[in-house]
């Protein structure tokens, strides 16, 4: 080794350490500048309300300066979009949309028919002896014989189908009334000449929830009005449903009559409910008569066999004498 020459092993470590320090210093400066730019960009975005509190620097992706205007425009449109949607979207808008009239539906709709017998002087007072209630689909919900409060004078078997034997298993009127009203309350009640059934039940059903099938012919011919037509359930069933009811000599079946009334209602259900919805807004004086108070139609000759009406004579003179015949059969005279 030449004198004065520095050993190679001692010279290299010092150069290496210097280079390492420079590299670390330069990296630190580079990181500091990046951090400063990061913090400046973050502060700018927060000032423009484009950046909320982030979970951490590592999870926050910031746009480059060239992308910032586009982000700002997108954010502005994003903030304005809910306002436009709240005013125009159908789900949030309060503007009324034309809809069909609400329909009662199967659960809220029942049909009823009652059969009456004669009590009081000459059997001229009608009292409930059988009641049947069917559902919208025609299922029998109630069908029981009922013992009148007064002694029966005329069973009216030819039309009511009630005989003395039926009264052996009949239930008291008060019991039947409670059971039936539980089925009717809160529901749309369908029936033919319903004022007679409600009168026998000693009950007044809300007019808005009453569908009397005596209106059906008028709905089919003039959907814009509701005027009761004096036509029998038997004729309506034959002409509109093409079915025969109330045939034979065993009297009417309240179950059959209730089912027929429901079928007639379903025939014009849509038009009827639309008419009811529109008439609800009309003044009270423009509405038709209430089916719960009209008693004249009950004794109209179209509701009873011709031989009965012919034998009654002049109804306005106090009514006819009771027909002779089998026990339990007789004619019902008109009210004085």
UniProtKB/Swiss-Prot annotation:
Q: Where is this region: Disordered?
A: 1-37, 56-102, 276-336
- Nuclear localization signal, short sequence motif: residues: 164-187
Segments carrying motif Nucleolar localization signal: 25-33
GO MF annotation list: DNA exonuclease activity; exonuclease activity; nucleic acid binding
Composition bias of kind Low complexity appears in 56-65
User: What are the protein's UniProt keywords?
Assistant: Apoptosis, DNA damage, Exonuclease, Hydrolase, Nuclease, Nucleus
Subcellular location as annotated: Nucleus; Nucleus, Nucleolus
Q: Listed GO cellular component terms?
A: nuclear membrane; nucleolus; nucleoplasm
- Domain Exonuclease as annotated: residue spans: 109-265
Q: Which PANTHER family match?
A: APOPTOSIS-ENHANCING NUCLEASE, RNA EXONUCLEASE REXO1 / RECO3 FAMILY MEMBER-RELATED
What is the protein's given name? Apoptosis-enhancing nuclease
As recorded in Swiss-Prot or TrEMBL, the protein's gene is named Aen
């Amino acid at each position: 080794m030449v004198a004065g020459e520095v050993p190679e092993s001692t010279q290299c470590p010092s150069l290496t350490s210097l280079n390492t320090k420079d590299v670390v210093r330069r990296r630190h400066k580079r990181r500091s500048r990046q951090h400063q730019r990061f913090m400046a960009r973050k502060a700018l975005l927060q000032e423009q309300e484009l950046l909320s509190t982030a979970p951490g620097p590592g999870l926050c992706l910031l746009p480059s300066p060239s992308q910032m205007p586009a982000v700002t425009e997108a954010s502005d449109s994003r903030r304005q979009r809910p306002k436009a949607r709240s005013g125009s979207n159908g789900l949030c808008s309060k503007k009324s949309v034309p809809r069909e009239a609400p329909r009662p539906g199967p659960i809220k709709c029942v049909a009823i028919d009652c059969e009456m017998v004669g009590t009081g002087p000459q059997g001229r007072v009608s009292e409930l002896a059988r009641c049947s209630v069917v559902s919208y689909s025609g299922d029998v919900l109630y069908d029981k014989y009922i013992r009148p409060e007064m002694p029966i004078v005329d069973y009216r078997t030819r039309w009511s189908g009630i005989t003395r034997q039926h009264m052996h298993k009949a239930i008291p009127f008060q019991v039947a009334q409670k059971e039936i009203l539980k089925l009717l309350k809160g529901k749309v009640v369908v029936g033919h000449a319903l004022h007679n059934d409600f009168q026998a039940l000693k009950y007044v059903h809300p007019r808005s929830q009453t569908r009397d099938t005596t209106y059906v012919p008028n709905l089919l011919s003039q959907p814009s009005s509701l005027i009761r037509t004096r036509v029998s359930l038997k004729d309506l069933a034959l002409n509109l449903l093409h079915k025969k009811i109330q045939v034979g000599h065993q009297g009417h079946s309240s179950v059959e009559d209730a089912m027929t009334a429901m079928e007639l209602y379903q025939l014009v259900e849509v038009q009827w409910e639309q008419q009811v919805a529109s008439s609800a807004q009309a003044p009270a004086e423009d509405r038709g008569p209430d089916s719960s108070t009209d008693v004249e139609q009950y004794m109209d000759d179209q509701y009873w066999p011709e031989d009965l009406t012919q034998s009654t004579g002049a109804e306005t003179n106090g009514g006819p004498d009771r027909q002779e015949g089998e026990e339990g059969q007789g004619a019902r005279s008109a009210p004085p």
